[in-house]
Structures are given as structure tokens and as C-alpha cells.
Swiss-Prot record:
Sites of Phosphotyrosine modification: Y24
Family: Belongs to the globin family.
Organism: Echinops telfairi
Assembly, per entry: Heterotetramer of two alpha chains and two beta chains. Two external cysteine residues at beta-16 and beta-52 cause reversible polymerization to octamers and most likely irreversible formation of higher polymers.
Residues with PTM N6-acetyllysine: K16
Record gene name: HBA
Alphabetized PANTHER family for the sequence: HEMOGLOBIN FAMILY MEMBER (PTHR11442), HEMOGLOBIN SUBUNIT ALPHA (PTHR11442:SF48)
UniProt-annotated binding residues for heme b: H87
GO molecular function: haptoglobin binding; heme binding; metal ion binding; organic acid binding; oxygen binding; oxygen carrier activity; peroxidase activity
Tissue: Red blood cells.
Protein name as annotated: Hemoglobin subunit alpha
Length: 141
């Protein structure tokens, strides 16, 4: 459960990322594919060359979904219900991949935000991404 301090930290990090969240999402997805090549299996239809337009576009989709989640931290299941259905029933993404992408997003944000990515912000964002992952995999039964 996210505390009030966690929610404030997550909102602060997301605001600092500002208009770059789409770019950071693409970079995090790139980092995931490079670090964990098995994650590429879900994207046979995409150009997975590092920095490709396909990766950047999907990374922006990820970032947009996270922006939605940041705005609905008190009701993540409601806000992410359609995405949960998509990932569980249609795409059938292995739940471990959400953890891998979350890790790569944390690394990406740390690289870009520097001193603004404090240990407290890191911990709060990690909890937030874990909560998002839990919601996205909640229908995997």
C-alpha cells in the first residue's frame, strides 16, 4: 500500500520527468530488450533495433499508462482494468517482464533525474511500479 509520502514522491518524480516521460519510457523499453533479450518475444511485429520508432512509440504507450496510474493512485485497479485485461487475456505477457521493465525504468529515471531521484523517491517509485505490476497481473488466474 502506498503511503501519502509515497504518493507525493511518485508525483514529484513524474513531474520532474515532465514532457520527457515518453522518451524515458522508450529508453527503458530499449534497456529492457538489451538487458533481457527474452522480453523481445512478445514483439515479433516490431523493429527492435535500439532506438527504433517502434520501440519509442511503445515506450510512450507505457509512459502514458503510467501517467494515468500516477493520476489514479487511489484506484489503480479501476484505472488499469482494460490494460490488465489486455495483458492477461490477449497478450499473455509473463508477469516477470513487468518487474524487468520496472527495474529498467528506475535505472533510466535515475540516469536522467540525478540528484532529484533521491533514495526516498526511488523507494516510493519502486513500490508504485510494484503496485502497477500487481494490478496488471491480477487477472492471471
Amino acid at each position: 500500500v502506498l503511503s501519502a509520502a509515497d504518493k507525493a514522491n511518485v508525483k514529484a518524480v513524474w513531474e520532474k520527468a515532465g514532457g520527457n516521460v515518453g522518451k524515458y519510457g522508450g529508453e527503458a523499453l530499449d534497456r529492457t530488450f538489451l538487458s533481457f533479450p527474452t522480453t523481445k518475444t512478445y514483439f515479433p511485429h516490431m523493429d527492435l533495433t535500439p532506438g527504433s520508432a517502434d520501440i519509442m512509440a511503445h515506450g510512450k504507450k507505457v509512459a502514458d499508462a503510467l501517467t494515468l496510474a500516477v493520476g489514479h493512485m487511489d484506484d489503480l485497479p479501476g484505472a488499469l482494468s482494460k490494460l490488465s485485461d489486455l495483458h492477461a487475456y490477449k497478450l499473455r505477457v509473463d508477469p516477470v517482464n513487468f518487474k524487468l521493465l520496472s527495474h529498467c525504468l528506475l535505472v533510466t529515471l535515475a540516469c536522467h533525474l540525478g540528484g532529484d531521484f533521491t533514495p526516498a523517491a526511488h523507494a516510493s517509485l519502486d513500490k508504485f511500479l510494484s503496485s502497477v505490476s500487481t494490478v496488471l497481473t491480477s487477472k492471471y488466474r
